Amino acid sequence: MVLATTEQIAGYEIIETLGIVLGNTVHSKHLGKDIAAAFKTLAGGEIRSYTELLTEARNIAIQRMIAEAEKLGADAIVGIKFGSSSVMQSAAEVLAYGTAVKIKKI
């Protein structure tokens, strides 16, 4: 599966647009890590537990988006975008979406 944030893929022609595909997940951290993160905000710097949380959530969202595209018979997903939002305290949703397409090499 070819993934692109652009609308076109160099060296390929889009021969069919199959539709919008998306993947999302909501993740939360363990209460103990949340308390440790609160203390980290006092000192400043990266809060690694939240960085790991969002990285893991983004990867899951991408895999779910790819699975939707594969069900449609897509070769690629173009125009990929990401969104995130706080669902509740210590829980974040990550959304990945794009357009599933069939492509051929030029």
UniProtKB/Swiss-Prot annotation:
Alphabetized Gene3D superfamilies for the sequence: Hypothetical protein apc22750. Chain B
Source organism superkingdom: Bacteria
Disulfide cysteine pairs (residue numbers): none
Q: Name one Pfam family in it.
A: YbjQ_1
* Family of the protein in this entry: Belongs to the UPF0145 family.
Q: Which PANTHER family match?
A: UPF0145 PROTEIN SCO3412, UPF0145 PROTEIN YBJQ
Q: What name does this protein carry?
A: UPF0145 protein Tlet_1264
- According to its UniProt entry, this protein's organism is Pseudothermotoga lettingae (strain ATCC BAA-301 / DSM 14385 / NBRC 107922 / TMO)
